[in-house]
Curated annotation (Swiss-Prot):
<dbReference type="GO" id="GO:0005524">
    <property type="term" value="F:ATP binding"/>
</dbReference>
<dbReference type="InterPro" id="IPR041562">
    <property type="entry name" value="MCM_lid"/>
</dbReference>
<feature type="compositionally biased region" description="Polar residues">
    <location>
        <begin position="851"/>
        <end position="860"/>
    </location>
</feature>
<dbReference type="GO" id="GO:0097362">
    <property type="term" value="C:MCM8-MCM9 complex"/>
</dbReference>
<dbReference type="InterPro" id="IPR033762">
    <property type="entry name" value="MCM_OB"/>
</dbReference>
<feature type="compositionally biased region" description="Low complexity">
    <location>
        <begin position="999"/>
        <end position="1012"/>
    </location>
</feature>
<comment type="similarity">
    <text>Belongs to the MCM family.</text>
</comment>
<feature type="region of interest" description="Disordered">
    <location>
        <begin position="721"/>
        <end position="767"/>
    </location>
</feature>
<dbReference type="GO" id="GO:0000724">
    <property type="term" value="P:double-strand break repair via homologous recombination"/>
</dbReference>
<dbReference type="InterPro" id="IPR031327">
    <property type="entry name" value="MCM"/>
</dbReference>
<dbReference type="GO" id="GO:0006260">
    <property type="term" value="P:DNA replication"/>
</dbReference>
<dbReference type="Pfam" id="PF17855">
    <property type="entry name" value="MCM_lid"/>
</dbReference>
<keyword id="KW-0547">Nucleotide-binding</keyword>
<dbReference type="GO" id="GO:0006974">
    <property type="term" value="P:DNA damage response"/>
</dbReference>
<keyword id="KW-0238">DNA-binding</keyword>
<dbReference type="GO" id="GO:0003697">
    <property type="term" value="F:single-stranded DNA binding"/>
</dbReference>
<keyword id="KW-0378">Hydrolase</keyword>
């Protein structure tokens, strides 16, 4: 079936009007060209054309071979019409060889194919995507001839038959209308001077490997190019061909089988090398990645590790390998030096490891996320298969591209690299360094580009011997090894911890695989690596200094590899530094990039001049990337002798850390503020917001009563920080400046940290309120002696009036005159002057100051009015300040036992939850009132008064050999009485409280005579203390209500029986052994290891979770110093253990 005359006229008219409307500028540009006989193309989008007229689309899909010549004629008519309508005709020149090129077909299975077409597609116009594997020479094709009838001299034009390889078949009979029936013709065109010729070329395309399923062999087909399409592509290009599927065969012979083949007659070719396949990069995508790096601007290494964790996530750990693969995929910047020589920007990586170490997994993943990649194995690769081969086809020699040529501009992955034969491996030397392949085969001399990154994997030759060189272990020549920028060694050494963690990782992924939300998808990774290749980072001066100094050190090393430590090493360092800057999404190579590259190079077998090689298999992701980088800076820059750069880099890290902590504090404060708005009423919301504004600065610690609510901002502290502060207090290492200010070491460090958080949503907790009701500085003592600072939740239904009633006992007897307020400057910031006093009772160790509290003569009503907008401070004499300093420094101060502190400070109802209801609070008040009545009743007893009078004359005798003696406190008390101090009011209830504490501690000290019993008692007490601290910390971590554990429930410090007072007169103090006291103090320092909450698998934590990343003296990364406790994955046993501790 063919198109009729009317259909041809319709198609011509519609296409001519369409071209004049949409492509008028292109026609004008073609007509301005000088060459008249050249071929010119006009690219037309098929979607736009079909939308203009659907009937054209139907004709085009049904009869493409007939419609395309009509399009060319209509284009010439449109050019003629434009030329006639143009006023300046002298600037244009009419062209005859115009061709309409159709592109942009609708994406549907009928028109778009990713695989080679089959027989059913013959006669259809399709778009086929593939890779050019062979290009033939350009030929001259005679497409038509003229034949003249010998009888009537009629001339007949015959076109070459495409289906029979462009052969000419003379006419059978004369077609003259006058009725000439002659069958003899003479060809007018001579073979030496053909009349009608055009350029002709055949190429061979192959299906793209990444679009095939596993095990499928890629098929290929011939594509015919004519006219201006000739030489539009080369071997290795990814192209999309738009054309008509046709079949052709050679001339038929008797008793010969017809050789039929399917070819694609191209109408247009689009080269896709510059455009990544399946990757769309627009402003929205760029904004997404920019927001990601803005989030990690203060800790960019953590953002980089998140990207590395998404690289080949099925392989556990191997941090160094993943970082090296990511840098190789990112690549460096290609440049041309002053001599005109092109310096490659692509890096090469060789993975050397034992079988089963995950080398092939990295190769497969890298090939997937790279748009243009080739994956091959060395066992089946030859020199011709890797580079280029010469093939004879149809009597002529053609060149077929190999793996390296096909991967031009992409990635070539070669597995089992050592399986390639020796003479075949030498053929890729030029491809790796000069990135070209020079060919002189079968009379063909040419040079092909191989601008590719090579990622190879190999096994060592037998057992890897660390004493031998890498060339001997791998059986590769030094010239080939020196062309690899990195050579990482993965040794499967015997490590039970590593085997346990790998097995648990694999079994979990097999049993219940789940995808982490934090990991990037493969499409996102593919888009990101395509995006960062557009960055062109420049080297900074600091990075140049580090790389040059390291290169010089490598050259001076006694154990250097002469084949490696050439100028290629310096170029490799530059390329890898630029690649790391690309990964970090920067356009400048900084000191951070240079330090990271030197660390990777030291882990590679190409380095090792500073610290020696590292087994990259057992390296893990660091818990704190900033701390690990800090250690790398201190180690490497110190070895390189760059102290100035080290100081600058450490200062930069400090700034980043402070900014990061500031932002986190502001975020937490904002979260607390939102929580207050939900819970409190409107009036309380206003007070909370005003107080938050006053206390939100990170450098200030506020203590005051604002409005009707008390706010204390307690700094957050880790276990390690608290351990250090306790050690500092016990050793007495307090600076003179801190002694002059009278502030404890813990409090000062808390003030300097700046990352404070409002306690219990900004309000004073109930425990602290209860401790402060004895008119002492107990709230400040808790800041000094606290081990774990639980942050409690705000109670529900808490109103301003109730808070005012609870705070009122704190302020009724304290100094509240405005003149008593005093603010001093501490460390360059305005701080509230906190004065700490120490009492003389041996049991309290300065914890109770009720005997020396300055009372205020004002009434409670007045205090209630004055406390609305004032800050409450308590002042004591200078003598008491000096006593406190002596107690902190350990001068003549009795030892402090943890159990005594808990006994003294534990209130009557300390076990009541902090989120108790108003009924419980009222019941607690009634219990306190009853206790006070009972204490007053005992004081009024005359026998009790007599015993108190006797007790006033009681004193301990000082023992010369004792370290922890109560005599020091007695002397301190006597000295305090001699000092000129105003007379203070002391109530009987306060005396009883102090005497009760004294009796309790004396009873405990008397038990120390029996050595074995005391030792058991100390061990049990220390265990209880550790359990209490751990349970408090876990409850604080999980944001649960905090319950204080009573260690001595039967002992009440507020009540002292008469029999106990009578025994005091006959009491004789016997000291505990000195070594026992030392063991006790040492045991009290033991803190539980905190288990951070979250969904993170515990078996993944390869390193102890400390404040700094633990590293060996010669290790730049976290290696296999594993802890059995952290690698334990028996979660059921751990949960049961936590439940037992909690109960």
């Amino acid at each position: 079936m063919y198109l009729g005359f009317e259909q041809v006229a319709l198609v011509g008219q519609v296409f001519e009007s369409f071209v004049l409307e949409h492509h008028k500028n292109e026609i004008a540009q073609i007509l301005t060209e000088k060459e008249e006989h050249a071929h010119y193309s006009l690219v037309v989008n098929a979607m736009t054309l079909f939308e203009a007229n659907m009937e054209i689309g139907e004709y085009f899909n049904a009869f493409p071979n007939e419609v395309l010549p009509v399009f060319d004629n209509a284009l010439r008519c449109a050019a003629m019409s434009f030329l006639q309508s143009c006023s300046e005709k002298y600037t244009f020149l009419m062209k005859q060889n115009l061709h309409a090129r159709i592109t942009g077909l609708p994406v549907c299975p009928e028109l778009t194919r990713e695989h080679i077409p089959r027989t059913r597609d013959v006669g259809h116009f399709l778009s086929v995507t593939g890779t050019v594997i062979r290009t033939s020479l350009v030929k001259v094709l005679e497409y038509e001839q003229d034949f003249m009838c010998n009888k009537c001299k009629h001339v007949v034009t015959v076109k070459a038959d495409f289906e029979q390889h462009y052969t000419f078949k003379p006419p059978i009979a004369c077609s003259n209308e006058e009725g000439c029936n002659s069958t003899k013709f003479t060809c007018l065109s001579d073979s030496s001077s053909p009349a009608s010729c055009r350029d002709y070329q055949e190429i061979k395309i192959q299906e793209q490997v990444q679009r095939l399923s596993v095990g499928s062999i890629p098929r290929s087909m011939i594509v015919v190019l004519e006219d201006d399409l000739v030489d539009s592509c080369k071997s290795g290009d990814d192209i999309t061909v738009y054309g008509v599927v046709m079949q052709r065969w050679k001339p038929l012979y008797i008793d010969m089988r017809c050789d039929l083949e399917i070819v694609l007659k191209a109408n247009y070719i689009s080269v896709n090398n510059e455009q990544p396949c399946g990757v769309v990069i627009n402003e929205e995508v760029r904004k997404e990645y920019e927001d990601f790096w803005v989030k990690y601007r203060n800790n960019p290494l953590e953002g980089r590790n998140e990207i590395l964790a998404s690289l080949c996530p099925q392989v556990f750990g191997m941090f160094v390998v993943k970082l090296a693969v990511a840098m190789v995929l990112a690549g460096g910047v290609q440049r041309i030096d002053s001599a005109g020589t092109r310096v490659r920007g692509e890096s090469h990586l060789l993975l050397v490891g034992d079988p089963g170490t995950g080398k092939s997994q990295f190769l497969k993943y890298a090939a997937k996320i790279t748009p243009r990649s080739v994956l091959t194995a060395g066992i089946g690769s030859t020199s011709a298969g890797l580079t280029v081969t010469a093939v004879k086809d149809s009597g002529e020699w053609n060149l077929e591209a190999g793996a390296l040529v096909l991967a031009d501009g992409g990635l070539c992955c070669i597995d089992e690299f050592n399986s390639i034969k020796e003479h075949d491996r030498t053929s890729i030397h030029e491809a790796m360094e000069q990135q070209t392949i020079s060919v002189a085969k079968a009379g063909l001399v040419c040079k092909l580009n191989t601008r590719t990154t090579i990622l190879a994997a190999t096994n060592p030759k037998g057992q890897y011997d660390p004493d031998e060189s890498i060339s001997v272990n791998v059986a590769l020549a030094s010239p080939l090894l020196s062309r690899f920028d990195l050579v990482l060694v993965l040794l499967d050494t015997k490590n039970e911890d590593w085997d346990r963690i790998i097995s648990s990782f694999i079994l979990e992924s097999k049993g219940c695989p789940r995808k982490s939300d934090k990991l990037w998808s493969m499409e996102k990774m593919k888009t990101y690596f395509c995006l960062i290749k557009n960055l062109q980072p420049k080297m900074s001066q600091d990075a140049n200094v580090i790389l040059v100094r390291y290169y010089q050190l490598q050259r001076q090393s006694s154990c250097r590899n002469a084949a490696r430590t050439t100028i290629r090493l310096l170029e490799s360092l530059i390329r890898l530094a630029e690649a790391h800057a690309r990964i970090m999404y920067r356009d400048v190579v900084t000191t951070e990039d240079a330090i990271t590259v030197v660390s990777i190079m030291e882990s590679s077998m190409q380095g090792g001049a500073l610290l020696g090689g590292v087994n990259a298999l057992h390296t893990s992701f660091p818990e704190n990337p900033r701390e690990q980088y800090r250690l790398q800076c201190e180690l490497l820059l110190d070895k390189l002798g760059l102290q100035k750069l080290l100081e600058e880099e450490l200062q930069r890290l400090e700034r980043q850390q402070s900014e990061d902590s500031l932002e986190s504090d502001l975020g937490e404060s904002a979260t607390n503020l939102v929580g207050h708005k939900v819970v409190h009423s409107e009036c309380v919301m206003e007070e909370t917001f005003s107080t938050f504004e006053a206390s939100s600065l990170p450098d200030e610690t506020h203590l005051g009563v604002t409005g009707s609510a008390a706010f204390i901002q307690t700094p957050k502290k880790t276990i390690s920080d608290m351990t250090k502060s306790d050690d500092t207090i016990r050793k007495g290492t307090i600076t003179p400046a801190e002694q002059n200010r009278g502030i404890s070491t813990d409090a000062e460090s808390s003030l300097k940290q700046g990352n404070a958080q409002p306690l219990a949503g900004g309000h004073l907790s109930e425990n602290n309120l209860t401790k402060c009701t004895d008119n002492s500085l107990g709230w400040f003592d808790t800041l000094q002696s606290i081990q774990m600072s639980p942050i409690t939740k705000q109670r529900e239904g808490c109103t301003a009036e109730k808070l005012q009633q609870e705070v009122l006992p704190v302020s009724t007897e304290s100094s509240c005159h405005p003149a008593d307020k005093k603010v001093v400057n501490l460390g360059g910031r305005n701080k509230l002057e906190v004065l700490q006093a120490s009492g003389s009772s041996p049991g309290g160790n300065g914890r109770d100051l009720s005997n020396h509290t300055v009372t205020c003569g004002s009434s409670p009503e007045r205090n209630k009015r004055d406390l609305s907008n004032h800050i409450v401070t308590e002042h004591v004499s200078k003598k008491w300040r000096r006593i406190n300093k002596d107690s902190l420094c350990g001068k003549n101060v009795p030892s402090f036992q943890p159990q005594s502190e808990n006994t003294d400070s534990a209130p009557v109802c300390s076990s009541v939850p902090l989120h108790s209801t108003p009924d419980v609070a009222q019941r607690r008040k009634r219990i306190i009132a009853q206790v006070e009545k009972q204490s007053k009743a005992e004081v009024e007893d005359p026998d009790t008064k007599a015993r108190l009078a006797q007790l006033a004359k009681f004193s301990f005798k000082r023992h010369s050999k004792l370290v922890h003696s109560p005599a020091g406190d007695t002397d301190t008390a006597s000295n305090a009485q001699k000092h000129d101090h105003p007379v203070q009011k002391i109530t009987l209830s306060e005396k009883l409280n102090n005497l009760g504490r004294t009796v309790n501690n004396v009873d405990k000290s008397s038990n120390s005579v029996n050595g074995s019993k005391q030792q058991k008692h100390v061990e049990n007490t220390s265990k209880q203390t550790v359990i209490t601290q751990k349970s408090n910390f876990e409850s604080n971590t999980l944001n649960a209500p905090v319950h204080e554990t009573k260690l001595n429930e039967g002992c009440d410090s507020r009540k002292v029986s008469s029999s106990t007072l009578a025994k005091l007169a006959r009491f004789s103090f016997s000291p505990p052994p000195e070594n026992q006291a030392a063991e006790t103090s040492k045991e009290t320092l033991i803190l539980p290891r905190a288990v951070a909450p979250g969904s993170k698998r515990k078996c993944f934590e390869l390193n102890p979770s400390t404040d700094k990343t633990t590293m060996s003296s010669k290790s730049l990364f976290s290696t296999t110093d594993l802890d059995d406790e952290e690698l334990d994955v028996d979660w059921e046993a751990e949960i049961k253990g936590n439940q037992r501790i909690a109960t």
